[in-house]
Amino acid sequence: MPVSGEAFLGLLPELVATGFLLVVLLGGVFAGPRSEALVAALAGLGTLASFAAAAGLLAAGFSGTFFGGGYAVDPFALYFKLIITATAFFTVIAAARWAERTGDAPEYMTLIIAVALGGMLLVSMRDLFGVFLAVELATIPSYAMVAFDRRRRESAEGGMKYLITGVIASSFLLYGIVLIYGVSGSANLSRVAEAFGEGLSPVAIVGLVLMISGLAFKVSAAPFHFWTPDAYQGAPTSAAAFLSVAPKAAIFAALLRILLDGMPQAAPTWTALMAVIAIVTMFVGNLLALRQSNVRRMLAYSSVAHSGYILAAFAALQGDAVSSGVQAVMIYSAAYAVMNLGAFLTIDLVGEEAKSFNGLFATRPMLAAAMAVFMAALVGIPPLSGFFGKAWVIYAGAGSGSALVYVAVAALVVNSVLSVPYYFGIIRNMFQEEPVSAGGPAKKGDGGVAFTVYAMALLTALFFLGVGPLAALAAGSGLL
């Protein structure tokens, strides 16, 4: 099949990322031991160039389906590519000094770009086997990122647990895809939708459940969440921050495309399943987060709960609420990316234990203010980014007309209240407790981490200024 120039143009963000991935990897080999700073700069340039390519295509109104309908470049995909490349860029900035000190900048930066590349491919896939390959491209480097810090035993343990559960999840996903392919006779989402025009057979339902289960592993949805705290605690802080947002955004985008493009007739089945998973995930994440004194593990369980909030929007994808449900997923993904990336990276500047934040306002007031913004946003306090994500989910759920979705929305409200003690506990420690030492916090970070934290705090606080354009973009995403 000949590849048109238009297809190459649509693939520009991925091609740019691939080119820089090779340059970064080979740069570490040929430039010698003093290439760490150069490699980090090239990685930052590559992720920024991919972001610019995606932004240019979006601004130009580019849209098309290529490779036999198996790959779509539309506003929906480009929106998520912007999230993925932006988080990759800021992760490179935050990780640069650490990677230079360890002498592993080429390898670490290559992994960041590889995860971003897999995510970009994933959000455009309209072929189920392509989805599987893109998921693997995004997750295999993730295993290495979690286990990357060879000096810490927890890193190896977290990486091993992540690898084992990831392999199980991939098996579920692939088996589900094979069942769907066997029943429908195609892996292309358009043809799958045609084959299931009159509803899903029992075998197809099993395949659907297995696919959703496999992807639920990847986004830390309960009961498939158990790898998350150990992986995030063991990973380098920049890796935990990046993996908590970028791959998850890509998985949510892929799941939206699979369900709405490939199985719209089965919406009553998968929306009910999503509602149940969402409710369980919210409660599991928040109840376990309440028990944590380690802030990194607390944020890991918090990420489980937020996956539940986003899955509640999936449950609302029925009736007149489909459009608002898609908007909710898209807006929440952007909102969560900025506030969670910043919250995780703040740990690098302060410390992992809750007591490390004691008296932070007295010693580093700007950093304390930034962390307070992140914690309040994760609760959903207006007008911060998290509020708009949750508000859109509630709005979509209210318009769904489903009693089960109403329960999921009520669970979201209850769990938001349930999360207040552990988020605001950090704020209380920073503003009311005595500093951990006379000299200030126990740990200081570098300029790249601080820059990223303050940038994310600013984006979190000013998110309301971009909600209108984001909502308009989501409404015209081209998915529906």
From Swiss-Prot:
The keyword Disulfide bond does not apply. It is found in: Cell membrane. The keyword Cell membrane applies. Keywords: Cell membrane, Membrane, NAD, Quinone, Translocase, Transmembrane, Transmembrane helix, Transport. Belongs to the complex I subunit 2 family. NDH-1 is composed of 14 different subunits. Subunits NuoA, H, J, K, L, M, N constitute the membrane sector of the complex. This is NADH-quinone oxidoreductase subunit N. It comes from Rubrobacter xylanophilus (strain DSM 9941 / JCM 11954 / NBRC 16129 / PRD-1). The gene is nuoN.
